[in-house]
Amino acid sequence: MGTFFAEVQLASSARPDRRETVKLLVDSGSMYTWVSATVLRDLGVRPTERRRIVTIEGRTTERAAAEILITLEGRALHTLCLFGEPGDLEVLGAYTLEGFGLAIDP
């Protein structure tokens, strides 16, 4: 299976009129959607919690998280998003894919 990207629109749940279009790597191996903290903060998204995660390298770490509004192919939903740090990939994760009723077809 190859890698592919999805173009999505992101917005703060509090400011849905202010949107940013980004391309995210579709990664069903990642539980959560990850987006650059800079992009999220520019949209007015503020962290509401911290999530403990295990990286692909097997390290346990924490990232800030918040609910965002995400639009994919004309459909919108609220989903949990992690604040990516420098070096983190921006990905569309399994939790969000399942929210849209989507899965990767190998």
What would you call each of these model-derived segments?
Residues 1-106:
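Pepsin/retropepsin-fold aspartyl endopeptidases
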